Amino acid sequence: MKVDLNADLGEGCANDQALLQLVSSANIACGFHAGDAQTMRQSVRWAIEYGVAIGAHPSFPDRENFGRTAMQLPPETVYAQVVYQLGALAAIVKAEGGIMQHVKPHGMLYNQAALDPLLADAIAQAVKAVDPILRLVGLAGSELIRAGERAGLVTRQEVFADRRYQSDGTLVPRSQPDALIESDDLALSQTLAMVQRHQVQARDGSWVPVQADTVCVHGDGAHALNFARRLRDSFQQENITVTAQ
């Protein structure tokens, strides 16, 4: 059994280099919610050094609230913004001798695209226009995954180790107090259930089917690094190979 382990990088956390030694894919902030040309270049260099798959992490234009502000933008505007961000990272990756392999939207862009087919189509078409070989990463079972499939892209369905799920398969909003799983043991148990049994227990107790191609871990704080190490160890014990797909 194989699974990808991904993390968001270039967002101002001090643990990026250490985290890159634990994951198989990196989603690099492209400047709209965090990061700049220098952080993008450094993240790309580290990813190449550690053999980690490089991906773009585009966002709504929202540096003030870290890309977590809901926005109602015309699809053509979102299309242009995503193309702009992918182009910036692709140029840096090319200059450093690497290959950009995937795209994972950030924050509210990701969450809204999970539910809004028009927004999801705009993102998928932008990815296809930049490079149809790029993989599109989205919430498992979401509109973004369906949009990627309609566009003829290879999609990767994502699950979250430390986020609680609702009965419809969406994430519990961060604005709610139980959105995050604080217990490492519970997060590990949830992740193994998603990867091995293709199901996740929602907060109402129901079991929801889910496809886990890639698992997201968050990298802010020393605790996050310890959890990522525990997750890698758990995968090894269960004979699950961590690799970009």
UniProtKB/Swiss-Prot annotation:
InterPro entries: Glyco_hydro/deAcase_b/a-brl, LamB/YcsF/PxpA-like
GO BP terms in the entry: carbohydrate metabolic process
Pfam families: LamB_YcsF
Catalyzed reaction equations: 5-oxo-L-proline + ATP + 2 H2O = L-glutamate + ADP + phosphate + H(+)
CDD domains hit by this protein: LamB_YcsF_YbgL_like
Any GO molecular function: ATP binding
Keyword Nucleotide-binding among UniProt keywords: yes
Enzyme class per UniProt: hydrolase
Domain of life: Bacteria
UniProt-listed Gene3D superfamilies: Glycoside hydrolase/deacetylase
EC number: 3.5.2.9
Keyword Ribosomal protein part of the UniProt annotation: no
Keyword list, A-Z: ATP-binding, Hydrolase, Nucleotide-binding
NCBIfam families: PRK05406.1-1 (NF003812), PRK05406.1-3 (NF003814), PRK05406.1-4 (NF003815), PRK05406.1-5 (NF003816)
Task performed by this protein: Catalyzes the cleavage of 5-oxoproline to form L-glutamate coupled to the hydrolysis of ATP to ADP and inorganic phosphate.
PANTHER family: 5-OXOPROLINASE SUBUNIT A (PTHR30292:SF0), UNCHARACTERIZED PROTEIN YBGL-RELATED (PTHR30292)
Subunit structure as annotated in this protein's UniProt entry: Forms a complex composed of PxpA, PxpB and PxpC.
Similarity annotation: Belongs to the LamB/PxpA family.
Name assigned to this protein: 5-oxoprolinase subunit A
Taxonomic placement: Bacteria, Pseudomonadati, Pseudomonadota, Gammaproteobacteria, Enterobacterales
